């Protein structure tokens, strides 16, 4: 990860940072997996997804599987770039304290 450091206020809140970090490690992730991994309610996760989707950071697909609606989420290129830049900015902050 060699992104230009850029602190991102949208990603920074702990819940969103956890969501984006989880999505960064995979291609498509099921809504239920994210919900269960982070211990969030459906409504809390949906609200965070709406914010991230509105910023263009995630993409959401709702394919029909076994007659049940599933929700799959992925990090977009914009979202991945923002996440990598945010992580780089956090590393710079931590490194400046260690000097």
Briefly describe each language-model feature range.
Residues 1-4, 18-21, 25, 81-99:
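Amphipathic alpha-helical dimerization/coiled-coil segments
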Residues 2-44, 65-74:
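N-terminal helix-turn-helix DNA-binding core of bacterial DNA-binding proteins
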Residues 56:
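Glycine-centered, phosphate/nucleic-acid-interacting loop/turn motifs that mediate DNA/RNA or nucleotide
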Residues 60:
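Short beta-strand "wing" residues that participate in macromolecule-binding interfaces
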Residues 75-79:
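Accessory beta->alpha helical hairpin/"wing" motif in late/C-terminal subdomains of nucleic-acid enzymes
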């Amino acid at each position: 990860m060699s992104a230009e450091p850029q602190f991102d206020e949208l990603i920074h809140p702990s819940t969103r940072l956890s969501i984006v970090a989880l999505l960064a490690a995979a291609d498509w992730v099921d809504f239920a997996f994210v919900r269960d991994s982070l211990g969030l309610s459906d409504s809390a996760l949906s609200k965070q997804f709406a914010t991230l989707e509105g910023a263009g950071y995630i993409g959401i697909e709702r394919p029909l599987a076994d007659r049940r609606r599933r929700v799959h989420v992925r990090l977009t290129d914009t979202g991945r770039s923002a996440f990598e830049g945010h992580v780089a900015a956090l590393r710079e902050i931590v490194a400046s304290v260690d000097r």
